[in-house]
């Protein structure tokens, strides 16, 4: 396809190996260091791009305190080849933060406010816990269900509304680990994982080039034996069918079609459309349905046109209703999360949006797809979606 000057193109993508938050590989690595490592390595392997051209570093991060505080985008960029004359900002849309970072860069490019951006995100959930410093307003319960802030209970509600059984969820959980393990063994993640140093279980420093979160030994029987994690009386959502608490970062280089052509760079993909949408916080996991419908309409497409889909697996009980109402549940094995998802790889909040987008581009490249959708639910009732076309 030919590019228009203000088309938004993805030039490259990379991510860290995903590490367990409890005693995992990144336990002695700070969030800014993970981020700076990715940015530096991506710029190093894209030497046609002068770091001085970077307009802005836009980084997703949810819990912006401690080592993730004081604008971690700037903290990280100062430790890279990007000069001090380039800007940096940290954004949060909870789970969709780094996809929002991508959208922010894309909107700037489309309106002529810059040509080259570095985007991505990070969350070190081992160093900065999910609820650290959070103080919800009690008056919020006058406007939304009190349990809306408990993501697992919103997944229970959504699953119940859509008739999702415990066995369906367990099967989905097993699938995630099996596909992620298969992708690892077959080298499918080599294009996206940027190796970095970490510590093994014995405390030895080594280079990791694989995700330590995947459990290939996961079985249906094993998951069936787990107790409900959020609703002890009659609940169906377990730790085995929920996204893992992990540490990780992801990064993309994004630029205008004109600048890519000027530099002689062959992009991975172009953004066809973007969308966000809101839903009742009590069923926050349903957000990808309206955001994807909106994005497809903006692109003049239908779900039948889409070759591959990456849906963040916050919970199996949430993912299955979304796939059902997007009318791709019967095509899941052909189109959806072919390299597994967050149940196997984890969901470091600020990292995940760019991570699933990059994984989608990899899947499209490896399987010959043209059009892809990356979408995710967002805490407190939102969805965010990006439609990509491979160039």
Curated annotation (Swiss-Prot):
UniProt keyword annotations, A-Z: Acyltransferase, Cytoplasm, Fatty acid metabolism, Lipid degradation, Lipid metabolism, Transferase
Disulfide bonds: none
Biological or metabolic pathway of the protein: Lipid metabolism; fatty acid beta-oxidation
Main location group: cytoplasm
Catalyzed reactions per annotation: an acyl-CoA + acetyl-CoA = a 3-oxoacyl-CoA + CoA
E.C. no: 2.3.1.16
Catalytic residues, chain numbering: 95 (acyl-thioester intermediate), 347 (proton acceptor), 377 (proton acceptor)
Listed GO MF terms: acetyl-CoA C-acyltransferase activity
Record localization: Cytoplasm
Keyword Acyltransferase in annotation: yes
Functional note: Catalyzes the final step of fatty acid oxidation in which acetyl-CoA is released and the CoA ester of a fatty acid two carbons shorter is formed.
Family statement drawn from the similarity comment of this UniProt entry: Belongs to the thiolase-like superfamily. Thiolase family.
Protein name per its UniProtKB record: 3-ketoacyl-CoA thiolase
Organism field: Pseudomonas entomophila (strain L48)
């Amino acid at each position: 396809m030919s590019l228009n000057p203000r088309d938004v193109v993805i030039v490259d993508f990379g991510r860290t190996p995903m590490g367990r938050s409890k005693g995992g590989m990144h336990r002695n690595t700070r969030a800014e260091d993970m981020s700076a490592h990715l940015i530096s390595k991506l710029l190093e392997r894209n030497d046609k791009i002068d770091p001085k051209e970077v307009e802005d570093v836009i980084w997703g991060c949810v819990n912006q305190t401690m080592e993730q505080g004081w604008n971690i985008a700037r903290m990280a960029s100062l430790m890279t080849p990007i000069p001090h004359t380039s800007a940096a900002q940290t954004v949060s849309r909870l789970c969709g933060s780094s996809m929002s970072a991508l959208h922010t860069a894309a909107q700037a490019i489309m309106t002529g406010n810059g040509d080259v951006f570095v985007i991505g995100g990070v969350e070190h959930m081992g160093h900065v816990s999910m609820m650290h410093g959070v103080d919800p307003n009690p008056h919020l319960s006058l406007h939304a269900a009190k349990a809306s802030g408990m993501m697992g209970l919103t997944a229970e509600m959504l699953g119940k509304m859509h008739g999702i059984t415990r066995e369906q969820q367990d099967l989905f959980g097993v699938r995630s680990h099996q596909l992620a393990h298969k992708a690892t063994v077959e080298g499918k993640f080599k294009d996206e994982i940027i190796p970095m140093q970490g510590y093994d279980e014995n405390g030895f420093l080594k280079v990791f080039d694989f995700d330590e979160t995947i459990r290939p030994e996961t079985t249906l029987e094993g998951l069936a034996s787990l107790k409900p994690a959020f609703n002890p009386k009659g609940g169906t959502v377990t730790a085995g069918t929920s996204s893992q608490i992990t540490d990780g970062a992801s990064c993309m280089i994004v630029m205008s079609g004109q600048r890519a052509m000027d530099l002689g760079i062959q992009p991975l993909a172009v953004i066809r459309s973007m969308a966000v949408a809101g839903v009742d916080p009590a069923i926050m996991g349903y957000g990808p349905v309206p955001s994807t419908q909106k994005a497809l309409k903006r692109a003049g497409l239908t779900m039948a046109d889409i070759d591959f889909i990456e849906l963040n697996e916050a919970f199996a009980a949430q993912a299955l209703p979304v796939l059902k109402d997007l009318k791709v549940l019967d095509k899941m094995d052909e189109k959806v999360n072919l390299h597994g998802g967050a149940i196997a790889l984890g969901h470091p909040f600020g990292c995940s949006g760019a991570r699933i987008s990059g994984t989608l581009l990899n899947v499209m490249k490896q399987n010959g797809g043209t059009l892809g959708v990356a979408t995710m639910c967002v805490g407190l009732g939102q969805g965010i979606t990006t439609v990509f076309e491979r160039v």
